[in-house]
Regions:
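Alpha-helical transmembrane signal-anchor/signal-peptide segments
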Residues: 63-78
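Binuclear metal-dependent hydrolase catalytic cores centered on His/Asp/Glu-rich metal-binding motifs
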Residues: 174-187, 193-230, 234-238, 300-301
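Active-site metal-binding loops of divalent metal-dependent hydrolases
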Residues: 92-95, 125-127, 162-163, 187-188, ...
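Membrane-embedded segments
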Residues: 75, 79-182
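Non-catalytic terminal accessory segments
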Residues: 1-67
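Conserved beta-sheet core of the metallophosphoesterase superfamily
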Residues: 178, 233-309, 314
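Beta-strand-turn-beta hairpins that frame and shape the catalytic cleft
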Residues: 75-89, 181-182, 189-201, 221-223, ...
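Extended recognition/assembly regions associated with phosphoester-bond processing machinery
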Residues: 11-15, 21, 53-56, 73-75, ...
Length: 314
């Protein structure tokens, strides 16, 4: 992680040097005798690097260290009235060992989630970070021991992501389950709430596991209400008609959302279609959280790390 800060500081120092040179050029000559168009050019040449400097500083040092709780409501046709108002805490892509994702941040995740008093907590994969120039591997037992303090009357359920399987999916699963978190890998679980019930269906990660979407959903009794969980939202088009809602993560919201451009890089074969937030398509609802950590580059810009409290209504 130290290398990530060295990299970011090197960029900032380069921008500062460039800005200094521009300011020197900006002040050369008799300002009163310079044509107006040249004044505009010089001013722009000074201001633009300053804006870039601020954006880089924010993206590497400020925004990745933020964490917000975001409230979302999804209205689903034919959602059972007895399940109206179900509140699910959605957490994804923690990536322990990445920039700013340490014991203190894990404690903050737990505290902020518990303050919201959700009915159910779902963890959508990628608890691990690789050993790289900007992150270091933290054993899954560390993350799981922190997450065991999550509190919800209906329990805490999880799926695994590609980074978990690239490390050791079996070890990550054992760590979570040893700390009271049930992992659903092409498995289902019935949740009873108030006077009704619904089923969670955990779908295996798309990038690293064989796909058995229809077979997994078929484990749920016919006519039952289903909330599907997975790491990668690209499975969304493959959902059977009986699944009204899929919760996913993986994309990090693109990590960088540039004004007028959007998200240049999204790890999805559908481009930016499933980048983040709520989408309704072909009778199904999809919700994708932007997650908490980072990967590839230790940067977030206009994509704030989040915990989502999702309320489902009929």
């Amino acid at each position: 992680m130290r290398a990530a800060f060295v990299f970011a500081i090197a960029i900032l120092l380069g921008l500062l040097l460039f800005l200094f040179q521009q300011l020197r050029w900006f002040g050369r000559g008799d300002w009163r005798s310079i044509p107006r168009w040249q004044k505009c050019v010089r001013a722009s040449a000074a201001v633009i690097p300053l804006l870039i400097f601020g954006a880089v500083f924010w993206g590497f040092f400020i925004e990745p260290n933020r964490l917000v709780v975001r409230q979302e409501t999804i209205q689903i046709d034919n959602w059972p009235p007895e399940l109206n108002g179900l509140r699910i805490a959605v957490i994804g892509d923690i990536h322990t060992g990445g920039p700013f994702i340490n014991d203190r941040k894990l404690k903050q995740i737990v505290e902020l989630t518990n303050q919201q008093q959700p009915d159910l907590v779902v963890l959508l994969g990628d608890y691990m970070s690789p050993d790289s120039w900007h992150s270091h591997r933290v054993e899954p037992e560390v993350t799981a021991a922190a997450l065991k303090n999550l509190q919800a009357p209906l329990g805490v359920y999880a799926v695994l992501g590609n980074h978990d399987w690239w490390y050791n999916g079996g070890k990550v699963r054992r760590a979570l389950e040893d700390n009271g978190i049930r992992v659903l890998d092409d498995e289902v679980a019935e949740i009873k709430w108030r006077n009704g019930s619904f089923w969670l269906a955990g779908l295996a990660d798309l990038w690293t596991r064989p796909q058995h979407v229809k077979e997994t959903i078929a484990k749920v009794p016919r006519g039952a209400t289903i909330v599907a969980l997975t790491h990668n939202p690209d499975v969304f088009p493959d959902l059977p008609a009986s699944v009204p809602l899929l919760l996913a993560a993986h994309t990090h919201g693109g990590q960088v959302n540039l004004p007028l451009i959007g998200t240049p890089i999204v790890p999805s074969r559908f481009g930016s279609k499933y980048t983040a937030g709520h989408l309704f398509e072909n009778g199904h609802h999809l919700f994708v959280t932007t997650g908490i950590g980072t990967s590839i580059l230790p940067v977030r810009f206009r994509v704030t790390p989040e915990i989502v409290i999702l309320t489902i209504k009929f």
